[in-house]
Amino acid sequence: MSLYEHVFLVRQDVTAQQVEELAARFKGVIEANGGTVSKVEAWGVKSLTYRIKKNRKAHFTLFNIDAPAAAVQEMERQMGIDEDVLRFLTIRVDELEEGPSAMLQKRDRDDRGERGERGFGGGGFGGGRDREDRPRRGRDREEAATEETF
């Protein structure tokens, strides 16, 4: 049996529960044909780079599959028939990744939030210094002298 990574996109107006039901149905197709699905990851709703069948967003789902080619072909055939599935892509791999995929790791990184206040200058222009940290020169000195007289 061969190892595959399979990603499919489902229309955005389908509920998350219906996406799970679709994933379970396609997983059942693989298992009925002598294969196994070792990992199912729901990546959630993401924006598409371009419109696919008049949709700008889609539910993304990943399968890690260990199955014969006939099982994967049958699953792809059924996905092609299903109106809710916008696109799918199956890639044969030498070994399956353990742990969360790169997309889930990216989402975890994005969920960390702000980094907060930094102890040093904070970067950017000026390094956190105000103009009062250095002596005035030229035109600035003249403006400062007129400000102090009022």
Swiss-Prot record:
Keywords: Ribonucleoprotein, Ribosomal protein, RNA-binding, rRNA-binding
Pfam families: Ribosomal_S6
InterPro entries associated with the record: Ribosomal_bS6, Ribosomal_bS6_sf, Ribosomal_S6_plastid/chlpt, Transl_elong_EF1B/ribsomal_bS6
Cysteines paired by S-S bonds: none
Compositional bias ranges of the Basic and acidic residues kind: 105-118, 128-144
Molecular function GO labels: small ribosomal subunit rRNA binding; structural constituent of ribosome
Chain positions covered by the region annotation Disordered: 99-150
Alphabetical GO biological process terms: translation
Domain of life according to the entry: Bacteria
CC terms in the record's Gene Ontology section: cytosolic small ribosomal subunit
Gene3D superfamilies per record: 3.30.70.60
Family membership: Belongs to the bacterial ribosomal protein bS6 family.
Function: Binds together with bS18 to 16S ribosomal RNA.
PANTHER family referenced in this protein's UniProt entry, alphabetically: MITOCHONDRIAL 28S RIBOSOMAL PROTEIN S6, SMALL RIBOSOMAL SUBUNIT PROTEIN BS6M
Identification of the protein by name: Small ribosomal subunit protein bS6
Organism: Azorhizobium caulinodans (strain ATCC 43989 / DSM 5975 / JCM 20966 / LMG 6465 / NBRC 14845 / NCIMB 13405 / ORS 571)
Gene it is expressed from: rpsF
